Amino acid sequence: MSKNIRIGYAGFISFGSRILSLFTGLIFITIVTRNLSQYDFGLWQLILSIVSYAVLPNVVIDYWILRNLARGERNATTAVLFSLMLSGGGLIMYLMISAFSAPKVGGQFLFFIVAMAQVPLSYLSITLQTISQAARPQAVGVAFMVFETAKVIVAIFAFLVFKISLNVAISAVLVALVAQCAVLLAMQPRYLYMRSFSVSAVKGWLKVAWLPAFATFAGYIGTIDSLIMTAITASTIVLANYRAANVIAAMISHAGAFAFALYPKLIGGAAIENESRYVMTLTMMFSIPMSAGIFVLAVPLLSILGSGYANAYMVLWIAIPVVAIGSVHQIFEAVLTGHERIDLSKNPSFRDYSKSRLFTVPSITLYGSIISLVALGITTYWLNSIHASAVTMAVAWAAIVICVSSPGLIIKWSMMKKSGTVFRMPWKNMAVYGLASAIMVAVLIAAGALDIKKVSTIDLVFKLLEYLALASAVYFVIIFSMDRTFRAIAFRSIDIARGVLRRSN
């Protein structure tokens, strides 16, 4: 079924919904950060990190159901039911980590208890997203927009009726998760579900559960950095500054939406060269100008979250290339693992799997995470001993991450070359996007982007929207005149819009 996925269509639906959700997400995070203390905001980020650890067991299902469905199997019912069963173990894990973490940050057990419901909802949401990714990737983008919108509605209601608190922020996420699950279920093809629970499918997943467990461990071990930072500093202020910068930098990651449909497409047997190059071109088309724009507008963007975060602009500057590099990592990993066929072999052994790219690719991430955590622990301990500022420690944190993530990209590129994988980087397109972004930045600076005066939050948001409109106009006019790929997309979009209008009339 994945052969029928249209990467461009699914990518633009997903990217468009993420861009729309940027505004709702910005509204939500602004309401929360401006009404919570830095301590409470950092505590909230800690709770979210613990929830992410608690959903780790679910990867046993999601890893294999994506590969199964992409090849035409129909085990969606089994995946959903087994996911809900595993959520019980996830709750136990959440409570254990919370019992260790809560005393370190003031013993605020009530907030950890309120957030418990997020664990089973996250299990269900992640599994439904995986099922949609294999069959109808655009549904994930639509559901994400609903998720963000629901959070804003709850936050605004709370702001108007009663005071925003950490409990309100947690409740908003819970309501949004319920809405997201409902949309995903409504949009999924019914033929994916069978009226039976396949015990044999579950046995097959559990037999090789070590592989997705390893891959997920390799990816998630890096998130322990929040716990390390909190434990060493006995404070959430450094975490708050680091996360605030990454909230802004994460806008760039939305360009990675174009790679979302690539993995199941390749698993289903699509050719690598054309699909991967197209996805890389689309990703660079948006990530390059977004990176440039956020770099120039770093201080005002952080100020929206609260005046206390404006000094974290250097953290944001470093976080920008980290996120941009992450999008390229995502494409390289999809190419390397998407065409791996070891799981189709008859009774593959542990040794067979350990030699496959399903194992070697996450191994790169694991080694990088271990190096990063050790470096972070040593550096933070030293900086804390000399009473360095929270921003200084956050900058060091970001610098360590980029120094570790960059070599991994080179290694994955080398792996593709050695395996004979044909992958051509769109260097000419990227040069055009870089030139257009440079001109865009020059226009923004000339228009006063570096001299924004202190104004109210609402005025600042509208001022930034003006710069966004100006930057978009400059950038897209330039690439329309210079880039054939963008022109083809633009004309195709116009044709689709005309077709929709004709049908509506």
Task: Please describe what each predicted stretch is.
Residues F23-L26, P57-V59, V80-G106, F157-L160, ...:
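Alpha-helical transmembrane segments of multi-pass membrane transport and lipid-handling proteins
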Residues N4-V60, L91, L95, V114-Q118, ...:
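Signature of the first transmembrane helix
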Residues S419-T421, K428, I445-N505:
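Membrane-proximal transmembrane or re-entrant/amphipathic helices at the cytosolic face
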Residues V55-E73, A250-E273, R277-T283, E333-L344:
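Helix-loop junctions and terminal segments of transmembrane helices
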Residues M1-K3, I113, G141-V142, L166-A172, ...:
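Interhelical loop/hinge segments that connect adjacent transmembrane helices in multipass membrane
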Residues T24, F28-Y53, L166, G204-V208, ...:
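Interfacial/gating helices of multi-pass transporter permease domains
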Residues V142-R190, A249, S363-W382, H387-M415, ...:
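Hydrophobic alpha-helical transmembrane segments
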Residues L84-F214, A442-I445:
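Hydrophobic transmembrane helix module of multi-pass membrane transport proteins
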